[in-house]
Amino acid sequence: MKITFYGHASLAIEVGGKHIIVDPFITGNPQAAAIDINTLKADYILLTHAHGDHVLDVETIAKNTNAVIVSNAEITSYYAKKGFNSHPMNHGGSWKFDFGKVKYVNAIHSSSFPDGTYGGNPGGFVIEGEHKNIYIAGDTALTYDMKLIPLRTKLDLAILPIGNNFTMDVEDAIIASDFIECDKILGYHFDTFGYIEINHEESIKKFFDKGKDLMLLAIGESIEL
């Protein structure tokens, strides 16, 4: 399983011979100017919620690739009405795709499209593929619901927001890593705007002091599990 960071909360995942894009917000992020969305491969586009900084480039990528949009029922209905392929899910449900299993789990946030359309309840994803398990939290506060995840799944990596203001901060993300019983964390949703700027060295040290590994990738950088 290969995971590439495209800035903010945008990710690419290669697993089971398939290409997945998560929450594409690339053209609106000056820090990701080197990423050409017209060259991205996508069999699936996973969306945690409907905010503009998570869905800006969905339609362009979906048109280019004919990817299947996977999200909650409200978000997939929104795109299905526009003619896009979609697979609806909802909280607590899972589905076996051709690359692995996806479960849609709870997040505490808000969710509406830039045009005001209701975007359903926000969520996150637990993905199981190639004998590796990851958790993509989406935009969320710290929540006791996270404690449910390790009851069913032993995680190899968790991708957690750490920018504060709109989501958890670093301290809450450390507690979240305890809840999900995963000490290998990829941080995201930071530094894109002034509201969510972080001190990288301090953040990494705070995790290290708790015996945990916080990775902060450069845009375009990848890790493999």
Curated annotation (Swiss-Prot):
Pfam families found in the cross-reference section: Lactamase_B_3 (PF13483)
Keyword Hydrolase carried by entry: yes
GO molecular function: hydrolase activity
Keywords noted in UniProt: Hydrolase
Keyword Hydrolase found: yes
Gene3D superfamilies: Ribonuclease Z/Hydroxyacylglutathione hydrolase-like
Family: Belongs to the UPF0173 family.
Protein's name in the database: UPF0173 metal-dependent hydrolase Fjoh_2786
Species assigned in the record: Flavobacterium johnsoniae (strain ATCC 17061 / DSM 2064 / JCM 8514 / BCRC 14874 / CCUG 350202 / NBRC 14942 / NCIMB 11054 / UW101) (Cytophaga johnsonae)
Lineage: Bacteria, Pseudomonadati, Bacteroidota, Flavobacteriia, Flavobacteriales
